[in-house]
């Protein structure tokens, strides 16, 4: 099967024509992938936001991970970065390195997931590069747009700002541990839930939706506490109410019903949640909650910015 695939699609152009051309959505600036470069129209009242991420086999994903999961991960990590800056995606470039184990079915599932996500979040593939090596790796550069007055950064919080978190945290960590043979008392349904939380992360685009009310923002890729520290100015700190940090009922049940030697701080410090931590003036509280409800986004106020440096969690400094 793989020999037939390699014989039939024995050049970069043939693979691109078969699997990737559909992803350009026939946008004029892509030149249907016939040129060596593409272009984007600029926007008078918007800033162009650029972010890039790389994921590597045996570091960011496993060899046997489903190809649609790998596609979802490379898209999610970039959309999450854009959202944290108050931006929505326009397009992206993709550099994909494949090896001899990649076949027709793998590429079909991979590009089908890309197509679905592009449709869902309204962006398209501008171009990229395809190469071969011993390990699979992907690097994507995303271009987004944001209104000039609403671009977000990590250093604009003020003392007294509320600290908010979207979604639930920690489920991805449990999924990763299950895939690494952690023995937990879980039925197949709950086990699948946690594994899918790791394999199929979902970006939260609330940064764009609420950008006019947000003072600072970051996505949770390196863990709640690690990323929160990045939001704090040198002379600012945070008071966090740990019991308010949102975790799913499934995770809470797991912690209560298993002999689990990890604390909630350990779980929250792992990362790969791709939710948002953001700060906002308390006067915008009701408007932010209203936007979250309208867009069916879970939102939790977990603390506030304080003058004393450091992160304080239930009166314990971390």
Predicted regions: what is each one?
Residues 1-318:
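Helix-biased detector of long, well-ordered alpha-helical tracts
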